[in-house]
Amino acid sequence: MKCVRLVKSSDLKNVEHLINNSGAGMTTMPKTSQEIKKRLIWSEKSQKKNIKKPSQDSYLFVLEDNGRIVGLSAIYTSVSLKKPSVFFKKSTSQLESKSLNFTKDLDVLSLHLCKQPYSELGTLFLKPAFRGKGRGTLLSFARFIFMSA
């Protein structure tokens, strides 16, 4: 049976095993036991809040398949509340020379800052052996259902 649920501190060993055996596929979660534990505690604290307005909360979800944790996803709220988020925006710029009859489109990356707090879908990882059959979709969409509740 498949089940998506919020993470618990007691999941530490299983979540740690999932992350540390993910190879290069898991770039959004810490690798050390101490840092993973902090993330789980942060999520549990967020779960216990009676929230009217999000304020730097984290919600980690696990996908269980027959009792084994095989996937992880997350929601982060109020990103950029205390310091701006930095991101790159891709655009296209056109160079043109009429005298040379030359036109060239160039991809340009420009640096942007976001100072408005926003919520972010983060971390989505599923063990390769469990991909397909809608499991990744379930793990991802569970976040939207949680946000709409």
Residue ranges and their predicted role:
Residues 7, 124-126:
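Hydrophobic adenine-recognition pocket in adenosine-nucleotide-binding enzymes
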